[in-house]
Design a protein with these regions (language model features):
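Short acidic, low-complexity segments enriched in Ser/Thr/Gly/Pro
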Residues: 113-117
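Short, compact, well-ordered microdomains
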Residues: 96-99
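Active-site loop segments of alpha/beta catalytic cores
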Residues: 1-45, 50-59, 70, 76, ...
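Residues forming anionic-ligand binding surfaces in small-molecule and nucleic-acid pockets
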Residues: 118-126
Length: 363
């Protein structure tokens, strides 16, 4: 099995880029070449690092310092070699609420993330939440992308930002409690607002994806799974608050449209609340795989979720799974490798090499 790619990516930090992409593309097709893909980084690892540099007048000013963030990432990858399917990717990041902000929403900036301000108090005002290419967040992401494309040559690839549109965007602007109550009191207005929060998503996605493609950059974002064509990771976090019936009424129609935007689709399924809708996810043919985020505390260890993982495998979908190093052997004994894409948190190069050898034996 061998895939032909439209262009080559030459990086001194990732000399085996094409070999790794062969494994990724086999995974998209629910196949295995020699071993399962493995990324040596945990989900949300970037949000555990606080930047103590203090040269800005506000948190927003720090987040908007495009050259600083690209330079910082460049320095972090120089001299390193990325093993497995760990790809050096800089993706422009203005926080998880950047898409609502592109529509005219507002956010509070913190050290490692942002929080949406719930600014919609009356649906009569929802018309003001519209995308504009003159929006400061969109323009800053564009600037950050251009700087990264120039500075990253030979060191890293460039991705696109985290995009939460549709229901999650409406949730950010309206507020979770209010939106959920509105589903009972004003269901048609909720549907109309969700539709409005989805309308410009293809335009924004295609703008950045086209820019990456023109610069021979794979399509990739925060989850670090690239595609030579187009990749998107839908998220449906609001679904954790909804019944199966509400999900099908308010979220599923939007999701079925969202997955049409890209060739390769991996659904972000965050926690058991969202997982109650798994049967609906598995019926969507465009979804290649599901990223399962089991959570912490009582939701650990991963072995309690083996039946859920096997259900996804049985449906012919891939599964992206976060593992601790200590869980690897038991996990390998419990499930088939077919469809598995591992994320393992370890910075130890020798440990990474040992894991890669171990995975070659997983049949």
């Amino acid at each position: 099995m061998s895939y032909k790619f439209p262009y080559s990516v030459e990086l001194e930090t990732k000399p085996d880029f094409e070999e790794s992409m062969q494994r990724v593309y086999a995974w998209y097709d629910n196949e295995i070449i020699d071993r399962v893909p493995v990324r040596f980084s945990a989900h949300n690892a970037e949000y555990n690092v606080v930047d103590h540099t203090n040269r800005w007048n506000s948190q927003k000013e720090r987040w908007f310092d495009a050259e600083y963030h690209v330079s910082k990432y460049l320095e972090s990858v120089k001299g390193k070699t990325f093993l497995g399917e760990t790809f050096p990717v800089f993706w422009p990041n203005l926080g998880p609420n950047v898409y609502p902000c592109m529509l005219g929403g507002e956010a509070t900036f913190g050290d490692v993330t942002t929080w949406a301000k719930h600014t919609l108090h009356d649906y009569e005002d929802m018309g003001k939440y519209r995308f504009s290419p003159e929006n400061e967040y969109f323009k800053k992401l564009d600037e950050m992308t251009d700087i990264a494309l120039e500075m990253g040559k030979g060191y890293f690839t460039v991705g696109y930002t985290d995009i939460h549109h549709g229901p999650d965007c409406a949730d950010s602007i309206r507020g979770t409690s209010e939106l959920c109550m509105d589903m009972y009191d004003e269901p048609e207005m909720v549907k109309k607002f969700i539709e409005q929060c989805s309308a410009d998503f293809p335009r924004v996605f295609n703008y950045f994806n086209d820019k990456l493609q023109k610069n021979h950059q794979p399509s990739v974002t925060w989850i670090n799974i690239p595609s030579y064509e187009s990749f998107h990771i839908p998220g449906t976090d609001l679904a954790a608050m909804l019944s199966r019936e509400q999900f099908r009424e308010f979220i599923l129609p939007c999701l079925k449209e969202e997955v049409k935007v890209a060739k390769h689709i991996v659904l972000h399924m965050d926690g058991k609340g969202v997982a109650r809708h798994l049967d609906d996810f598995l019926e969507i043919p465009e979804i290649n795989g599901i990223q399962w985020v089991q959570g912490v505390g009582d939701d650990e260890p991963i072995l309690q979720w083996i039946p859920l993982i096997q259900k996804i495998q049985a449906a012919g979908k891939g599964v992206v799974v976060d593992l601790k190093v200590s869980e690897l052997d038991a996990f390998m004994d419990a499930v088939s490798p077919r469809g598995i894409y591992l994320c393992i948190s370890t910075d130890d190069t020798e440990e990474q090499k040992t894991i890669l050898k171990r995975l070659l034996q997983w049949k």
